[in-house]
Swiss-Prot record:
ANK repeats lie at residues 46-76, 80-109, 112-146, 150-179, 183-212, 216-245. The modification Phosphoserine is found at residues 17-18, 20. Its main location: cytoplasm. Coiled coil: none annotated. Residues 274-336 form the SAM domain. Pfam families: Ank, Ank_2, SAM_2. Keywords: ANK repeat, Cytoplasm, Developmental protein, Differentiation, Meiosis, Phosphoprotein, Repeat, RNA-mediated gene silencing, Spermatogenesis. The keyword Repeat applies. One of its GO terms (biological process) is transposable element silencing. One of its GO terms (cellular component) is pi-body. This is Ankyrin repeat, SAM and basic leucine zipper domain-containing protein 1. CDD domains: SAM_ASZ1. InterPro entries: Ankyrin_rpt, Ankyrin_rpt-contain_sf, Asz1_SAM, SAM, SAM/pointed_sf.
Amino acid sequence: MAASALRGLAVAGGGESSESEDDGWEIGYLDRTSQKLKGQMLPIEEKKEKFKKALTTGDVSLVLELLDSGIISVDATFRYGWTPLMYAASVANAELVRVLLDRGANASFEKDKQTILITACSAHGSEEQILKCVELLLSRNADPNVACRRLMTPIMYAARDGHTQVVALLVASGAEVNTQDENGYTALTWAARQGHKSIVLKLLELGANKMLQTKDGKLPSEIAKRNKHHEIFNLLTFTLNPLEGKLQQLTKEETICKILTTDSDRENDHIFSSYAAFGDLEVFLHGLGLEHMTDLLKERDITLRQLLTMREDEFTKNGFTSKDQQKILAALKELEVEEIPFGELSEEAKLEISGDEFLNFLLKLNKQCGHLITAVQNIITELPVNSQKIALEWASPQNFTSVCEELVNNVEDLSEEVCNLKDLIQKLQNERENDPTHIPLREEVSTWNSRILKRTAITVCGFGFLFFICKITFQRK
């Protein structure tokens, strides 16, 4: 009887040889007795490989059978120290995760700082399956704030991979929104880096701090701009979600109910469709009456610095009309100020600047001040007077007022320095006039000569007129 059983194992179901890809693991085709007998004959390592294959392919029946055999534990470790639950989470198989958890698998297991929850959040699968896995793990007290060796938490992995509902569920379960990894990245930074707009909006709504910098001093908005996610850059630079922090006041159950029934994209697209953002490029074009060029420049990722250094052929290449080119080139000519590295020059070299060059510098500096005044006036006219007309909630007003106060101080310092410059020029002028060794300029010499010539001519004419009168008088006598 045993011999017949062994012969039965030689050929798998369907007439295929035992060397086939399935290796006879067709559930329900061979009888239970023959499968268990074959399982007992397999070495432990080979059985573990079969178990791993069943986990990765989602063969729940085979997993249950191997667990029931008693040879493999639900918390057994395979190569690299992974447990069955970690394998199931890595493929986002929610059914397997549930089965293993019901069998007593440890949801808080970790290997080299790699937790099962992190594995689930970074799994390759649909967001629906990943969400179910994460929800199951959290229900078994998995800690959402345990970080990996790179100090990345589950919410960072979920934000990086674009799983909006997973991010919201983690926050509702106690995940810290503003935790930073070894590079200073937060979940918001990761979402901005990868271009996940819906997650950026959701994180702002959940209280994420957009002003936290990375270790190299970059804000999430700058990370988004560097990776060419301009819409996210504008959102993070000029606006905040009007519902920022609102969900933090709700209970865990209310939050979960709200976040799982809200479509962030649909809810927020209309909110941000009408906001106006003012950057250096927008202000510059607005001052020239070229607002229609803004979208074109943004589409081609052209910054104000690049615009100021463009040549005429580059304007044509980028689709600028001749009239627009003339406006921009004229403005560039007015703004052009030759930088003089005074700190690198010797004292003698500093004195070689001509009066014309210095006057030209002052004139251009005055024009730039005028442009700055115009830019501020444009901003003032665009800002709504009534706070109720502001569609989006801004950051703390103290940030704006503090910057304005600093700007006022800088303007006052500039005014003081210009007054000092004026006094110095006046002092130099007075000293030059009183200096006996002063050599008059050619213009001054020519003016003095012209005065002498005029006086000489008047004197000659006077003598001539006097001589003419005297002559007439003598002739009459």
